[in-house]
Curated annotation (Swiss-Prot):
Its EC number is 2.3.-.-. Transmembrane segments: none annotated. The keyword Disulfide bond does not apply. It comes from Vibrio cholerae serotype O1 (strain ATCC 39315 / El Tor Inaba N16961). Its cofactor is pyridoxal 5'-phosphate. Keywords: Acyltransferase, Aminotransferase, Pyridoxal phosphate, Transferase. This is CAI-1 autoinducer synthase. InterPro entries: Aminotransferase_I/II_large (IPR004839), AON_synthase_class-II (IPR050087), PyrdxlP-dep_Trfase (IPR015424), PyrdxlP-dep_Trfase_major (IPR015421), PyrdxlP-dep_Trfase_small (IPR015422). Pfam families: Aminotran_1_2 (PF00155). The modification N6-(pyridoxal phosphate)lysine is found at K236. One of its GO terms (biological process) is biotin biosynthetic process.
Amino acid sequence: MNKPQLPDFIQNKIDHYIENYFDINKNGKHLVLGKQASPDDIILQSNDYLALANHPLIKARLAKSLLEEQQSLFMSASFLQNDYDKPMIEKRLAKFTGFDECLLSQSGWNANVGLLQTICQPNTNVYIDFFAHMSLWEGARYANAQAHPFMHNNCDHLRMLIQRHGPGIIVVDSIYSTLGTIAPLAELVNISKEFGCALLVDESHSLGTHGPNGAGLLAELGLTREVHFMTASLAKTFAYRAGAIWCNNEVNRCVPFISYPAIFSSTLLPYEAAGLETTLEIIESADNRRQHLDRMARKLRIGLSQLGLTIRSESQIIGLETGDERNTEKVRDYLESNGVFGSVFCRPATSKNKNIIRLSLNSDVNDEQIAKIIEVCSDAVNYGDFYFR
């Protein structure tokens, strides 16, 4: 039986993607897909910063909860907002970070999109850092808000935009997922107060790795009570597929009934909430892992900077700036051939000629591996067939 043919307007678009995203590369695959790593390679592609994904206590709690589960909650979380239905992990996460309220979501993407859809009216001014996560941009678009991008971490530019357009919502990441830079959170709080703006901080890449007991950068800086909203993907340090919204107001009462991602997606299941509870307990007592991760990240940042590479990172995320796609392909292949595997960030995550190979460190990385990465990058700098920006 013949398969149905796609209409030309779809087929032409797919042909364009295949030609420009796949066929153009040497291996015939997308640029993010390089060689297959071996067990001896240094793999820095995961966001599991405290190396908890295979923790035996978390696995045991998930298995036990799943085996004991008797409920059938395959429904929207909108129907489960009575106090007796809500998972205890929400109160524990609120206490952990110092916020009044926490609401679980199916992902960090859903948390950001749903929150902005809830709090924005059409034409609300959303002042968004140029490098903020795409889910924050999409949330503003969902709400028909007016997005005003400001230059990365440039508070003077932000002030100028607010003076021009009026109050709105300031939207930033605490740690940026491509370059590993840290937002000037204290100054952003001051700006939000000065101009009557709300402030939303996505702590996806700092929750668990920074702050007292891993409570995040806002907690570390004593700013929790000064910020209106915090969000996070729990698919980073928490090593699970979930997200959350924190607030110091009543917005989380409304999100489950206004946010399309909340209404039209099924709730997290009880065994998943139980797994998150155990993960939180481990994160709270993981100071040794956090300290080791910080030491390894500092050592690698210093070592790469001494090679003359442009390293803007202030965290465990380190971006090697590799320019255009053909050069990025060469750098990727060289690193992988020498046992170092990072994540390629290219269009649409970056602009076409500003690609990045991201090295995401975790607490299992050791001194010998850091030395190896620096050695491979040193050889790469002198190789001559490609360049670093």
